[in-house]
């Protein structure tokens, strides 16, 4: 009888314990503003500082998924063409790392809508090019944000000096509002899976990064093949390949006689490598991970068989 009397109390304690554990798990699944900011600073393809992200709102959509809206400070490089039209050329994704905006829009499949190169009205004082209005319009057109809008806030427009540049260039620092979808990866914490701006659709960042790397890989292979052809021309005239263990030395010898364009860095903005002996050579790129001697290295060797 005593054992039977204890059983309901025992079961009750188990049920209470389980409910408490579920409650604790639910608390741990909550996404704080700090966690959201950390995830956004390290979203795929980006390395941002904490000060570059201002989280405006966070909401859970399930125990392991959430959405967050934030303002992100981005740095863009604008270029002016021969017809005096401005375009967004690059976006800075990490310290000393830039991505080609045309390449990103091609991978994402985005198109720009607004015409932003109409002449600005006359103004007094120092003229800033592009004007804040034009910069905001170009960014809004790129990101699917109808200008004017608080979703695009220009912080600074400043000249961007590039030695021997053929086109005028300007740096634009802007705060862009983004919507993000996040997933709880357990021990890895919260991670951004998708991003949306303005009226654009949701974009999977890992898919975009993979698409960018695929295009860059094709570009790297084409560039290495071009250098390899120059080395074959060199051997045809000199009787051997260029003997060197530095890519910069090889390019200095090949350009411009055998190579019309000096190709020094790969699409990930890392120096190509060269190892050359009289009878053979190896050209390589460290690939997407920017590390030598790893599985994603891109290698072209000669002579071709």
Region spans (language model):
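Bacterial N-terminal signal peptides
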Residues: 14-23
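N-terminal secretory signal peptides that target proteins for export/translocation
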Residues: 1-10
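Low-complexity, acidic interaction segments enriched in glycine
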Residues: 165-167, 175-184, 189-209, 217-305
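Short, basic/low-complexity N-terminal boundary segments at the transition from targeting/disordered tails
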Residues: 37-48, 53-54, 137-144, 239-259
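Low-complexity, intrinsically disordered terminal/linker segments enriched in charged
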Residues: 30-47, 59-62, 67-73, 90-186, ...
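Bacterial Sec-dependent signal peptides at the C-terminal "C-region" and cleavage site
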Residues: 22-31
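Extracytoplasmic
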Residues: 50-53, 73, 278
